[in-house]
Amino acid sequence: MARRTWPILDPALFVGSLVVYFAGTPLGLDRVAAASGVAASLGATSPEPGTRLALLVLRLGALFPLGELAARANLGAAVLAALATALLGRLCADLLAAFRPPAHARQGPRDFLHEPFLAAGAALAGGLSLAVFQTGTSAGAASATLALLAGAWLAALPILRAAGRARHGFALAGLSGLAAGVDPVAGPLLWPLAFGLWLWELRRGQRWPLWAPLLFVAALGGSTLASVAPAGNPVDLRHLLAGLWPAGIHDHLALVGTAAELCDELGVVGSLLAGLGTLALLRRAPLVAFWFGFTVVTALLLGYWPAQSGLHFEATRAGLPAALMAAAVPMSAGAAELAARLGRARMVAAIVLAGLAVVSPVLDGGTSRWRRDVHGPERLLEHALLRAPLRASVDPGTAEMDGLLRYGAVLGLRPDLEIVRRK
């Protein structure tokens, strides 16, 4: 088994990013649309199609012995976001290690000391960008989607470089099946590319593709069963297969706006490094360049910029964050390409480039990322409950209010009210 390069990078990124995420995690609901998922996680309401991964994340967050239900759900999302950042850093480090000169070249271990700085800088630039930070510290499935994607990318990298083993193929098949079973963003981003790799490896005469479909189907069925079984309500085929195709692809105008938001959050330096890295990957690893290029474009087609809110956007809320995380991979390759041209100054250049790549995403949004309004949903719920008469039947009117009222019922507020189920 190949030795892992820079093993200290993974725990350092996880702990460091987790501290930052915890510092920005709100202690309550920061948006009304999250109330529906929190209520559904305890069986108070039926899950919507495409929200099953959110239910699994919220049930995981409910295990935290800190704060109320919403705060625990936010903390669970923060842990998964930190895991995604650590996996992304490991992916960038492995990619840079794959681009090293041959073993007989006149270079020693000291000539590669700049790699962990570039990998950590790219991972933090993606993980601490505004969209990733906001979605990763709030209740929902976005952080789990990012962790799922990062794990699948890490498993796919050796296969893309024609150096994969059976364990990499099995991991990719299992994660793709899990994504297709529960996630309408990670599913369309993974299983088409995984299917292409499966055909390619099968044509090369590898044996693991013969067993991969069984693992894919088992992961798809198991994840779907785990997410819908606690609800106790019958589900149709559209609900079960919601993760196999996109929840909705928007038009070209929304795509341009989302792409502009992507470049704005990465910053000028990050965007230039990502472009340079894409050219370098096209020359040295075209399959890797195609994989992440497809991921970025498809994620932009599925996602929306952070200004969009509401229950309608919950299923594809991780689209823009997934594009930001995927763009961090060519960013690390571009920074390494630029630093390598400076000879002995590459160590200093790597530190400077990593710092410049992180500064713009971290400063984006100013203090708003640390001061999330958790009073709006609470005041709306309090106002709705105060206006309701005793022992009344309440018609929520909208899906957002339905989730908010059922969230209040989970907390034990106004048990005398009967909430009319929306059809």
Predicted regions located by residue number:
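Transmembrane-helix motifs of polytopic, lipid-linked glycan transferases
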Residues: 75-111, 148-158, 329-333
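Transmembrane-helix signature of polytopic, membrane-embedded enzymes
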Residues: 88-128, 146, 167, 343-354
